[in-house]
Amino acid sequence: KNIAVYFRNPVALFSLEMSNVQLVNRWISNVCEIPSEKIKSGQLADYEWQQLDYKLRDLLDAPLYVDDTPSLSVFELRTKARRLVREHGVKIIIIDYLQLMNASGMSFGSRQEEVSTISRSLKGLAKELNIPIIALSQLNRGVENREGEEGKRPQLSDLRESGAIEQD
């Protein structure tokens, strides 16, 4: 969002976890620095209304393209990404989050193999389009149980259903 709002670089966000409405509510609260509960209630001070009006213009003018298709396949994403780059000059793609994607039409021995295939496909797409693709990922719960400050720092091996993501 910041890349689109403050630097005016076109960004595509594929949100498999949250709806457009949920994302927009979160962004408005973040950009305006006003708690979402306060915005929803409408109980804002005059200066907060002014801030909301001023900051919303930045958000509305941002070249941000959001797709909240649930259970998006890597093939559907590839088609949409190519179109967004061609038609809107998208400079970065963000996927929230990797493990909710699927590689429809293909059969796999395990979910780990499927996620690895999706990861490799995204890497190939990034090379083809010559833009970064950032795929968010969930972590295994083991991170929470490790001792000490350094122990809680996530490592590539902590990625859920990671398989070959470390190599991609």
Where are the model-predicted features located?
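Phosphate-binding/switch region of NTP-binding enzymes
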Residues: 113-168
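Feature marks short, surface-exposed loop/turn motifs that line or immediately flank catalytic pockets
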Residues: 20, 101, 140-143
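Glycine-rich anion/phosphate-binding loops
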Residues: 75, 112-113
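Conserved ATPase-coupling elements of RecA-like P-loop NTPase cores
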Residues: 102-109
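Conserved Walker B
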Residues: 98
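Hydrophobic "anchor" residues on beta-strands that sit immediately upstream
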Residues: 92
